Amino acid sequence: MAQTYSSEEIIISGLGFTRFAVALEPQPAFEDHPESPRWKRIIDRNLCWSGSFKITKSRYASCRLKGENRLDMKILLDVQEQQLIMTVADTEGVPLFPLKLKIRRNNFRESKLMEMINNLTKELTGIPGILGSTIAFTLKQPARRKIIARVNTHGNKLGAISRNPSISLLPRWSPDSRSILYTILSRQGTAIIQDKLKGKTVTLLRSENEVSSNRNFVNVSGGTWFSDGRKLIVTLSRGNNTDLYEFDIRSRREKRLTKHPAIETSPSLSPDNQHLVFVSDRTGQEQIYYKQLGTGVDFRLSYGAGSSSDPAWSPDGTLIAFTRVERGHAQIHMLDPFSGEETVLTRGRYNSEQPAWSPDGKQVVFASNSTGVYKLYLMFVDGTGRRRLTRIPRDFEESAPNWSSRKL
């Protein structure tokens, strides 16, 4: 990553998955304030959890600068006229631009700090920050049905999305984050629902009795969106065959994409809408396959002794996160589909699975049963920085996360 600084500008190129090296430098007025230790902890936490910064003397090992790491910038912390001022400066301490936050009753709103750091991230990288964005997931309540719930990146503002008497599964945010797709399961069968988050839901597809028509599907489940939000790729079953179909939301017409006698599920479409990855049991166990939509060419992507599932394209279309089961445990892997290079992100004598990307591609949310019950966790894309997302009681099970840029 090439970076140069002057007192007037910051030039950044080749960001990739790197993080900016930052030193927090409290000024005298900040240090003299009785709340300064607490404020500094909050600032450190949000810079770390943004996924964009490494900080000198951070409380978080995964975000702490070590050794003689070269600084990229400084952030000067000051207090003036009931304002917390975070001034971005070059490595010599020359101020570049200030970020200001109102203080009331010796406190400030953390949501405003998150917004400020998101704006700083966008100024530096051109990509909006993810602090305060929304993660939807399946929540299993004790002795009750599964619902679709949502929470923000700090584990706050927990709430229900689905409000129907059926079991709700597989949430998938629309590209504009204004609606969410999920599958419901009831005594009447399965259905794919589009929830527009304002009390309005639309049933896009519903399973029907197989004998009533050769066209009807005996099972339907949600999948992946095209980037224009007008079409989906979904899993549909007719007879004894389960395949992937392209589905037009407006016309309600479907087009079959896979025509193999195997069971094919879990579609994930690349950001450019040209490349599809999915799960198939063509070899007798689940593996990940790739299909080029323009030519129809498909081939196997994952190899190894165990099964592979849950593929998810990164937001820039360069990597695929997925789950591999080996020696009885599921772990999250990262695959470069073009070079074939594969990296293991999680390890342990427990399961970690169902990865989903952050909108900026710097973090992954996933489900793990490391405590005995499946809960949601976050980590950076290099596998470091693992932390529990929610504070939901132990007997609630959390799974199938999906991350949106929608702020909560």
Indicate residue ranges for each PLM-predicted region.
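C-terminal/domain-edge helix-coil "capping" segments
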Residues: 2-20, 96-160
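Short beta-strand->alpha-helix linker/helix-N-cap micro-motif
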Residues: 5-75
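Amphipathic beta-strand/beta-sheet edge segments enriched in Tyr/Trp
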Residues: 64-119
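A flexible loop/linker signature enriched in serine peptidases of the S9 family
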Residues: 128, 139-147, 165, 183-192, ...
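Residue-level detector of Asp-centered blade-edge/turn motifs that repeat once per structural unit
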Residues: 129-131, 175-176, 227-228, 271-272, ...
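Multi-bladed beta-propeller domains
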Residues: 152-167, 196-221, 247-263, 291-309, ...
